[in-house]
Amino acid sequence: MPRTKVFYFIPNLQQGGPEGQILELINRLPQRFEAVLCVYHGDNVFWGNRCPPGQPAHDLGVRSMNMAALDRLTDILRREKPAIVHSYRDKANFWARWAASRAGVPITITGCRNRMMGLRYLATEWFLQRKSKVILANSIGVKQELVRWARVRDDKVRVIYNLLDVDFFRPPTAAERADARTRWQLAPGTRALLLPGRIGIQKHQLGLLAAMRTLARRGKWPQDAVVLFAGRARDKLTSALVRRFARSPGLASAVRFLDAVKDIRSLYWASDLLVMPSLYEGLANAALEGCAAGLPAILSHAANVDAIVQPGATGWEVPTLRHAPLVEALEAALATTPERLAEMGRAGRAHVTARFAPRKDHVLDQMVAVYDELLTAD
């Protein structure tokens, strides 16, 4: 029986949740599907260890799309003759729909995985939605933004959460935690607060630093606490501001920059608390993974729209872009006993497992069901 070809399109494979998710999906697809991956460019591949042999199959060789790249993409689709085009990220969605329409691909699925979409994208989405059989969102918040601001039909958007491997992202044994802390040079007794994600406006590292400074000025930032920023620079200006702020008196010894971390699980294992005061998110993949690994978490409301954290039981939720509540949550977390934090972490793992990964292939089965539904209807 011939395999069904699915053509995946994403700008690149640099550090980021969508990039990891698309490769996880390709790796776990049933054998009756044949995956073909195409990127704008193959530079600075962060997820190389997850790439199946021969992927990405196509590299357009551009940093940003243009008409010549659109022609190349259209030609590739005509040669590959996929049954489905499935694109990830806003700009890729625009070009994928255009190329798929030109090439006569019968089914196009577009994936929106973050909020605060560009104004141009929102402005064109109302018209372009007719080129997508289905628009997949990974968060209730993303769907709400598409329906409210882009005027996409409610029934056109379906929410399928991120793939979460709770067998891999699990709490460490005592020996694994000790090894992880040694690897990340955390001395005995040091409390590690982890903010994973690219350095930029979205993840709001500046907000966390401001809250730390407030506690330090009040004499309430503990000498044994350190914040770990794990992520590449998203943009030069914000990254420079974050690093300059981190050198402020009272903060310099309490902040470490780790750049992009490939073995993120070991960093979860080494840490004591996850902190993500994001200004906007789709479904925060790092929050899911960290909680599955047994970390209690402080999340902004923007990062917790899909109820990753249960306030008071598995962590803290703070209003987005509010300084005082973040200060209060940090102070409360730092005053919480290790035993209570561990209890919250165990409850957090149970919660995210039940909500986002109740069985091994829960999300994969939902994705495959969408493919099968559209193939049957076509």
How would you describe each model-predicted region?
Residues 87-93:
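Short His-centered aromatic/hydrophobic patch
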Residues 16-24, 191-220, 227, 240, ...:
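A conserved mid-protein helix/loop that constitutes part of the nucleotide-sugar donor-binding site
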Residues 8-71, 76, 156:
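N-terminal strand-loop element at the rim of the active site
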Residues 296-300, 309:
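Short hydrophobic beta-strand element within catalytic cores of glycosyltransferases
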Residues 311-312, 316-324, 332-338:
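Conserved acidic donor-binding segment of nucleotide-sugar-dependent glycosyltransferases
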Residues 260, 279:
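Aromatic "clamp/platform" in nucleotide-sugar-dependent glycosyltransferases that forms part
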Residues 44-51, 226-252:
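Short, structured helix-loop element that forms part of the nucleotide-activated donor/catalytic region
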